[in-house]
């Protein structure tokens, strides 16, 4: 999945890093200071929500866009409470991820239409 995300995004954005677990995400985000981070709720070592909490607590300015299989509005609320601006379901990645990132860059929220929120 990570390779598919990078392939989709590299035509539209500069990709400064990619990682496969939540701990590495926090470490690399602190080092690279990206404008936007695309993360999954279900990640190894730290979940995406735990990583978001750490980033938010450390004062990260990165805008967070969650890409996930979870469609529960409880997850959407929790992600937004941890500083997320985007919530994209993996089933809608090809159509929703780029608009979600663009909205996040403008400090606006985006939720895949398949999710009731």
Regions found by a protein language model. Give the residues of each.
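Active-site beta3 strand of CheY-like receiver
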Residues: 32-38
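Short, flexible helix-to-coil linker/hinge segments that flank and couple to helix-turn-helix
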Residues: 76-81, 86-117
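Two-component/phosphorelay signaling modules centered on CheY-like receiver
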Residues: 1-17
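Receiver (REC) domain active-site loop signature in two-component systems and cognate sites
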Residues: 43
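Acidic catalytic/metal-coordinating carboxylates
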Residues: 21-24, 46-50
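Short amphipathic alpha-helix used as the core "switch/output" element in two-component signaling
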Residues: 49-60
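Short, conserved "switch-loop" micro-motifs in signal-transduction and mechanochemical regulators
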Residues: 70-71
């Amino acid at each position: 999945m990570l390779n598919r995300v990078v392939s989709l995004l590299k035509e539209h954005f500069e990709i400064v890093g990619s990682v496969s677990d939540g701990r590495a995400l926090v470490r690399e985000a602190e080092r690279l200071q990206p404008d936007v981070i695309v993360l999954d709720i279900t990640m190894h070592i730290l979940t995406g929500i735990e990583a978001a909490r750490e980033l938010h607590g450390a004062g990260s300015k990165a805008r967070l866009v969650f890409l996930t299989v979870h469609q529960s509005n409880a997850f959407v609320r929790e992600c937004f409470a941890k500083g997320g601006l985007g919530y994209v379901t993996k089933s809608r990645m090809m159509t929703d991820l780029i608009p979600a990132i663009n909205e996040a860059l403008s400090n606006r929220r985006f939720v895949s239409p398949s999710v009731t929120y």
